[in-house]
């Protein structure tokens, strides 16, 4: 009987260690306590409270398993331990949770089977009686520690306290000494706020580039907790930071002082479906020439908000032009101030004097935003790249359609089986996307006047190439990153794991293309990276794999001329610092901002 009890206790402790990486268990306990505290006392958003509770489930199960092991080792029958077994199986059976495991799922399954067998034998050999062992001290310590962390975190506006930062490298490299590149000549859309501060891709050409100085390593890192992913960050004419942050169920607008991260005002402005890969409802928004926020709310309504108090000042209902169950993905104005919008099921519309008019692109899904030039709009669907134009007060007219290789499947890291890029315009002739070809993705460059494909350049390792983010256009260079492996979203980068490495560049000059460089070590799970002509840097956000299980995220600079990594600086550790498809941004003062699952992180100059 003694051997049976010791075997059961050992197996229960083994389950506690194997079902979630021990380092991740600690990280999630601190993250969960922090998010719960901020949800209760700071942002006061119900589903943020739910997120905090979610992070705490597996740490709580681990504590209960150890508590059960102590009981089984003494005199308990093991019924409570048996009840815990379905929770232990969760990480092995649920794909979203598998990356949290310390071992392969089959190993945990075998341990659970053995544990259940021992517990059943123990229950059968132990008579029913009132147990007199005292093991509740462990649960009491857990509860006291959790309560203390909840209260302490609830009193601050920063990300949750995370003690594992000390086990991550601080960074590498130093400030660059390279010369500046020629300043960008990107057209200013007169209906939008000033470039490059008006949208997720900086301008209506979606160049993702700046002519601003970037911070150097060694600067201070600040954070602001919002409880949601702040995918798009803009700056108005007063220099204030304007953003929409999406929790699982809500979209909350923020007006923030970028120098202090003090929240000037905030307000819930919409709702969204609980999805990790659906960006409709507020993932994309644009700041117009009057400093107003324009975004597609759920239900097919284009909402216009004042950036003074985040109250609605105008709206356009375009739901009648959408297919059943279709949501608007993104909205941008053209040079005449007309709102263009795209829907997830292939609708492209424009709001003219007679209201919204639209056409449907054969039901082809549209998962990303679009680009707007003076004389046309460029949209990529799941099957083709389009140029469209407005015709009077009628629906948009298709100017040309260029099919691309959409591949055979949705690759890990993508939100759909198709191109993951918003079209990028450059120079006075080009438009670029990536395809989804198997086994190797290509950068596809077309003549934006005719749609003729000028070149297709394969990038990254065969069988491990995909991107879900727009190309960067800077000087004569197009920069692309590899996001292959960011699946399941969020948990794929837990427990020291990360995605496939890769960043590459091609030159595109006078209608001809050639590979420029390829970096096979930088790891960018999902950031919308940016570049600046000042010292010629790509500014990105990396998460290299680690052997100790600490999930460290880094602000990173890469030389746009050579592809060499110039410097990195630790942003922080844990899931709060996961940007999850959000972008990087430079402020007018040279601060580097990144939207994350918990809010905003910034590297100061």
Feature map (PLM): residue ranges:
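Sequence/structural signature of beta-propeller modules
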Residues: 2-266, 290, 605
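Repeated scaffold domains used in trafficking and secretory/extracellular systems
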Residues: 226-235, 271-287, 321-336, 363-374, ...
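Short beta-strand elements that form the blades of beta-propeller/WD-repeat-like
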Residues: 236-246, 291-297, 303, 337-342, ...
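Structural motif
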Residues: 248-257, 299-306, 345-352, 383-389, ...
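Surface-exposed loop and turn segments in beta-propeller and other repeat-based domains
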Residues: 267-277, 317-324, 397-416, 456-464, ...
């Amino acid at each position: 009987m003694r051997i049976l009890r010791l075997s059961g206790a050992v197996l229960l402790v083994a389950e506690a260690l194997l079902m979630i990486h021990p380092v991740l268990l600690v990280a999630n306990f601190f993250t969960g306590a922090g998010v719960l505290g901020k949800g209760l006392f700071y942002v006061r958003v119900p589903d943020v409270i739910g997120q905090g509770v979610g992070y705490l489930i597996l740490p709580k199960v681990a504590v209960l398993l150890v508590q059960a092991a102590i009981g089984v080792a003494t005199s308990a029958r093991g019924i409570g331990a048996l009840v815990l077994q379905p929770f232990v199986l969760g990480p092995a059976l649920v794909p979203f949770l598998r990356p949290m495991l310390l071992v392969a799922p089959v190993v945990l399954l075998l341990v659970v089977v053995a544990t259940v067998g021992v517990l059943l034998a123990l229950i059968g050999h132990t008579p029913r009686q009132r147990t007199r062992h005292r093991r509740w001290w462990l649960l009491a310590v857990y509860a006291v520690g959790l309560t203390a962390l909840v209260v302490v975190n609830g009193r601050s506006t920063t990300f949750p306290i995370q003690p594992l930062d000390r086990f991550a490298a601080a960074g590498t490299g130093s400030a660059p000494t390279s010369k500046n590149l020629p300043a960008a000549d990107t057209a200013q859309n007169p209906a939008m706020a000033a470039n490059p501060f008006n949208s997720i891709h900086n301008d209506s050409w979606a160049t993702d580039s700046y002519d601003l100085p970037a911070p150097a390593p060694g600067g201070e890192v600040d954070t602001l907790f919002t409880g949601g992913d702040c995918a798009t960050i803009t700056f108005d004419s007063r220099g204030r930071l304007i953003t929409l942050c999406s929790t699982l169920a809500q979209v909350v607008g923020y007006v923030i002082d970028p120098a202090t991260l003090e929240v000037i005002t905030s307000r819930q402005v919409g709702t969204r479906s609980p999805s990790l890969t659906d960006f409709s409802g507020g993932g994309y928004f644009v700041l117009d020439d009057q400093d107003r926020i324009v975004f597609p709310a759920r239900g097919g309504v284009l909402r216009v908000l004042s950036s003074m108090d985040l109250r609605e000042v105008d709206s356009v209902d375009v739901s009648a032009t959408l297919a059943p169950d279709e949501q608007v993905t993104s909205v941008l104005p053209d040079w005449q101030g007309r709102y263009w919008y795209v829907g997830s099921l292939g609708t492209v519309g424009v709001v003219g004097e007679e209201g919204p008019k639209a056409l449907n692109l054969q039901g082809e899904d549209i998962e990303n935003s679009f680009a707007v030039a003076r004389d046309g709009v460029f949209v990529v669907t799941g099957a083709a790249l389009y140029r469209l134009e407005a015709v009077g007060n009628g629906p948009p007219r298709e100017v040309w359609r260029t099919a691309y290789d959409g591949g055979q499947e949705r690759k890990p890291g993508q939100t759909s089986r198709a191109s993951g890029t918003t079209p990028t315009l450059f120079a006075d002739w080009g438009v670029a996307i990536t395809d989804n070809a198997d086994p190797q993705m290509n950068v596809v460059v077309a003549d934006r006047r005719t749609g003729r494909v000028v070149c297709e350049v394969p990038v990254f390792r065969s069988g491990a190439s995909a991107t879900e983010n727009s190309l960067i256009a800077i000087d004569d260079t197009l920069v692309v990153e590899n996001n292959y492996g960011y699946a399941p979203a969020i948990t794929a980068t837990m427990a020291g794991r990360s995605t496939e490495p890769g960043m590459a560049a091609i030159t595109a000059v006078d209608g001809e293309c050639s590979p420029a460089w390829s970096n096979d070590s930088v790891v960018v799970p999902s950031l919308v990276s940016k570049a600046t002509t000042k010292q010629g840097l790509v500014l990105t956000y990396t998460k290299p794999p680690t052997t100790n299980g600490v999930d460290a995220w880094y602000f990173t600079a890469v030389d746009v001329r050579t592809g060499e990594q110039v410097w990195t600086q630790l942003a922080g550790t844990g899931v709060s610092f996961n940007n999850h498809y959000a972008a990087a941004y430079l402020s007018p003062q040279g601060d580097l901002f990144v939207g994350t699952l918990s809010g905003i992180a910034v590297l100061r100059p």
